Amino acid sequence: MTTRSGRLAIPLAAAFAVTALGAGTALAQDEPAYAGLDKDLSGTTIKMAAIGGGSYEAMYDSISMFEEQTGANVEIVFLGDGFEIDRYLKTNYAAGTVDFDVAWNHTSFMSQFTNFVEPLQGYFSEEELAAFSPSIIEAATIDGNLQLIPRHADISALYYRTDLYGDADLQAAFEEQYGYPLAVPETLDQMNDHAEFFVAEEAIRFGTQFAGREEALAGRFYELLFANGGDYFDADLKPIFDSEAGVAAATWMQDLYANGLLPGDTPTLLWDGVAANFCNGDVAVYLEWYGWYGYFQDPESCPNVAGKFGMARGPVGLDAETHTGWAGAHAFSVAKDSQNKEAAVELVKFLTSEAVSFEESNTFGFLPVRADVSERVVAANADTGNPLDAERWELANLQVSEDFRTPPLFADWISFTNEWYPTLQAIILGDTSVEDGLAKGVADAADLLDSLGY
């Protein structure tokens, strides 16, 4: 496998090493099965534009097995984080300069790519598709066309430092000051109190945090918005986030920054940055993706927090019945302009197979999108010595079944977030008032959607 991209190379992940033990699609009867290995693709080069960063890249180490058993050569022509790959794909799709066969996709981004990806329902049997989450397959089918095959799902959960929440002295001091017991926060107000308390007690550097730019910021605001009973748009795509819920969400963010409870460089942070802060032991409690679990639990990568954190359901806001739960699924698509569609599909089948998916989910904590993989990871983590290894899967099942909420599914979601997030940054920094910033955001969104023909 070769790589040419903005990165030097794909880092090898020993934990994901996959050894080719035979040419069949399964290692043994009781082993998870591979797929996409039964065709001779000798002489075929499959080019791939992929998401990278964090734990995303480890899966690609398994591609050597695919190459060995099919005879194909896989070339990763671009590797970047979610926002970099999104920009790369949009640029090349729009310019007609597609030089890849397999491309990253995501349920939150897919609406903008519908004209550029190959409908996949004709390449997968009903039995093959039945292995995947029906709700994700349904959500990924637009006008009868299956846009993608899911790789893994994710939903934001509450990560918190158990050593802080379990400290008897801190518990006593908190209850004396705030009048209620220190426990895992169930509301956004409690989360604010805890952030304030831990920083004031000099128990931690930052009380909480969130990614502070691009869709990462707009998405985090979105889950605060719906936890407070609001939404970005009504059923007719009219922007409505200058509501009571919007004021509550924006005020929560602004107050945290004004009170010094967030990192000072919040407006520059994306996913890797906030994960690094928690890994370094600098953050008490925050909303984060399941996909970082394995990284945080690794004493070599994160010695300051490994074994010292817990996970919980996201808090509620003004709407006491609605928890945070921004969610989505990473996936693979085949470019409509690909000259090797059949071979590209085989690579997608391999990368989303039971065996590859199990290794990724079990090693790094990504949420499975296949029922067979879900069963395997639950069994594999039943008796690891760390109760959280198993408890997180029970929590994930609860959140996915009750709290799973994707962003508005329209083609220009990213165009909207690009328009909105600088204004949201200004609100957080105190450069504009909450009310004025929300009014501007709604007006700008209305103008944008009008100009785009909505």
Regions found by a protein language model. Give the residues of each.
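Short, polar/charged alpha-helical segment
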Residues: 32-37, 54-73, 420, 438
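Extracytoplasmic/periplasmic substrate-binding proteins
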Residues: 110, 219-228, 248-340, 346
